Amino acid sequence: MIQGEILGDKVLINDVEKAKEIYKLGYYGKPLDITKPKSPEDIKKPLILSLIEALYLSKKKIIEVIRDGKVIDDALLYKIGMENIPRFELLYTVYEDLREKKFVVRSGMKYGADFAIYTVAPGLEHAPYLVIAIDEEQEISPNEILGFGRVSHSTRKNLILSIVNQRNRSIRYIMFKWLKL
């Protein structure tokens, strides 16, 4: 099994060959040497995974996460995520669902969203969708929706609100698409 070492709120895959394997599986993580590799062979340095990616890959038995020289279980990794990342439970729920639907899911932070999702791959296409995760119990105003929409419109991406019922982990997706009339 591939090992990654937890460093704060990230997990480092030090072995470059293993980093290439993980990246090849679904464009997980960010290599230290290049922003958007076109292929796993472009990776020449270690790979950094977010805690969300690491938990997903750990649950899939693809990686094991090491802390202080010992393998940690998924429950502890989840707890570390909850302690270090605001809205971790909500974000992980959406991330896992999108990955299970076979999307390539990357951080959407630079776009003001939670995730950017690709149908092909980063580096080979621009992300067609931005995703914002919202708890079903959370109230949002029309102005907030307009704000979300402005971000997606200015970057020419479709906006998807993922509305999560935390009790049963169900998710409803609503897509906003700008039209020129």
UniProtKB/Swiss-Prot annotation:
Keywords: Lyase, tRNA processing
UniProt cross-references to SUPFAM superfamilies, sorted A to Z: tRNA-intron endonuclease catalytic domain-like (SSF53032), tRNA-intron endonuclease N-terminal domain-like (SSF55267)
GO BP, sorted A to Z: tRNA splicing, via endonucleolytic cleavage and ligation
InterPro entries tied to this protein: tRNA_endonuc-like_dom_sf (IPR011856), tRNA_intron_Endo_cat-like_sf (IPR036167), tRNA_intron_Endonuc_cat-like (IPR006677), tRNA_intron_Endonuc_N (IPR006678), tRNA_intron_Endonuc_N_sf (IPR036740), tRNA_splic (IPR006676), tRNA_splic_arch_short (IPR016442)
Superkingdom of source: Archaea
Free-text function comment from the UniProt entry: Endonuclease that removes tRNA introns. Cleaves pre-tRNA at the 5'- and 3'-splice sites to release the intron. The products are an intron and two tRNA half-molecules bearing 2',3' cyclic phosphate and 5'-OH termini. Recognizes a pseudosymmetric substrate in which 2 bulged loops of 3 bases are separated by a stem of 4 bp.
Name of the protein this chain belongs to: tRNA-splicing endonuclease
Annotated source species: Sulfolobus acidocaldarius (strain ATCC 33909 / DSM 639 / JCM 8929 / NBRC 15157 / NCIMB 11770)
Gene name of this polypeptide: endA
